Every structure is written in structure tokens, then in C-alpha cells.
């Protein structure tokens, strides 16, 4: 095997570790990422090469590249790095790639994806530029708020209770998603994302003001379904705001009386 390639994020390098992204299994990360991104493109989540996704398979991390049209992505476009080698890197901005495509640049989302893997042991992290997510951050900006909070909505059940906790949130629970401010360069968001993770240990997502959202999960299924649920709630919240409806309500639980 060719030794790992070490370089700065902007560096393009090539090696012969193409076997890492070659598989007939549709569930292989190198096949899943293009498939997922093509679906996300139809939803408007990764328009104009924005957004991306990353999947961790044990120590191997598979990443969508920068600058690629997400609906046209191929397995051969995928970067692969070693999580352990990255943790041992002397520089947080230095990457240890096992496999690099010859054309594209590594995604600036990479350190944010790595934060989800190292701090939450996530199996997948998704970054979208959903306009519903952006609109929610603008509404919160007007309110001077750094949290998205909503309760008493059925779709809240689509979220886990938190890191290393079993079960999902309930209908009457309050979903809380922190908001961090955007930066001129994506990589510079990393420390603020990590701070939000520390402050909100149970969150599965972080909103980025005027930018989008990062969502992660224990595996691809959970990350995808939580991202879908969150986008549903963002759209609902924007439309509720237009109708003058509150996101937080005090509703008495309905208790069934039948005993059979």
C-alpha cells in the first residue's frame, strides 16, 4: 500500500489507493456519499457545489470533495483519510490522506466533520445550505437569539435524546439547536462548532448563521433522517412565524381514559 499522503487542505495529491473507493456494494461509503448528495441536491440542500457529507467507517473517513457539482459526484471523487493519523497530526489544518482524487480540492468542511466523529463518535455528518435553515437563523438574528427551540410537534420524535443516551425525544419535549456565527472561511467555524458541542452535549446539529446547518448521527440512517426531520421543522417554523404562531407552546398532555 502506498504510504499516507500528508498535505495542507488546499493541496492536490494523488496515490494508487483507489481500491479504497472501489466497491460493488451500494452501502459502501464511497458509493453512498454520491448517492446521498444527489438526493440532497434535489432538495436544494447542496446547490451550486455547496454543502457536503462525510461517512466514518471505523478509522477510515470518506469525504466529498470541494467544488464538485454534488448531483454529478462519482465514487472516484471521494477523499479518504485516517482518523487516527489525523488525531496525531501536529497541525489541526494538516490532513493525512490515504487517498486523494487527482482533480479536486479537499472540502473546507473536513475539520467540522472530524469534530462530529471525534467528539460525538458519529458515523456520518451532513452539511446543507438549506434555505429553510438559513431563514431560521435570520429570524433568530432579529430576535437576538442563539438557539432554535420548538416543542409540541410530532416530528421532534425523529431526534435522539442525546449523546450516549437511549431513546428519542417525545412529542412534548423541546428540541434545542444552537446557532453559531458564520465566518469568512469554513474551516474557521471549527472551534465555534466544537464549543457549541461542549455547551449543548445532547444536540445532534448546529446551525450556522446565514449559512446552513451541520447534522450528525451514529450512522448514515440516523444522520439522514435527523437532517430530514430538522429541515421539516425549519420549514414549519418559518411558516409558523409568517402566521404569527409561536414555536414554544404550553399544551396539557392528553391522557387516554380507556383501560382496554
UniProtKB/Swiss-Prot annotation:
Pathway: Amino-acid biosynthesis; L-methionine biosynthesis via salvage pathway; L-methionine from S-methyl-5-thio-alpha-D-ribose 1-phosphate: step 2/6. Pfam families: Aldolase_II. Coiled coil: none annotated. Binds 1 zinc ion per subunit. Its EC number is 4.2.1.109. One of its GO terms (molecular function) is zinc ion binding. This is Methylthioribulose-1-phosphate dehydratase.
